[in-house]
Amino acid sequence: MKVILKEDFINLGKEGDTVEVRDGFARNYLLPKGFAVFSNKHNIEIFNQKRRSILKKQEAKKQMANDLKSKLDLVKLEFFMKSNDSGKLFHSINSLNIADELLKLGFDIERKKIDIHHGTLKTFGTYDVTIKLYEGISSIIKVEIKKEKKQEDKKSLSKKLNKADEQGERAEV
């Protein structure tokens, strides 16, 4: 079935494109949700008239993606994670964790646009993560996973400091 897309769709096409999709996908998803309309003579004429505004909108999206890319290229995320004695993380880092951290920094990035080359990050180190912003425009950010100090280390440090205070000495850390 041929439909005309009303907005950009990843792996399908851009707004105003006429695409061939399976009947069930069109009837059960694209048409009821308002993502597309049937490709008939009337709708084709309407979209031909809107083509100029669609192109302006796409150019504006491309410009916004370039601006966002220049800001994201400077971002470095740090995660402090707990691990077992062998150095394996108790919790891996995935695209949801990265999207949440980016949101805290003021970047509203959809989870599906974040591409972790290794699937999930399960060990300590620095990784390159790609964020797909627009067709042909992507940003690479650095994600660093560091070891979180164990609770025992914190307790022993505070005990040393308290003991030194009682004795009026300086604690060696």
From Swiss-Prot:
The keyword RNA-binding applies. Residues 150-173 are annotated as: Disordered. GO terms for biological process: translation. InterPro entries: Ribosomal_bL9, Ribosomal_bL9/RNase_H1_N, Ribosomal_bL9_bac/chp, Ribosomal_bL9_C, Ribosomal_bL9_C_sf, Ribosomal_bL9_N, Ribosomal_bL9_N_sf. GO terms for cellular component: cytosol; ribonucleoprotein complex; ribosome. Transmembrane segments: none annotated. One of its GO terms (molecular function) is structural constituent of ribosome. Gene3D superfamilies: Ribosomal protein L9, C-terminal domain (3.10.430.100), Ribosomal protein L9, N-terminal domain (3.40.5.10). Keywords: Ribonucleoprotein, Ribosomal protein, RNA-binding, rRNA-binding. Binds to the 23S rRNA. Belongs to the bacterial ribosomal protein bL9 family. This is Large ribosomal subunit protein bL9.
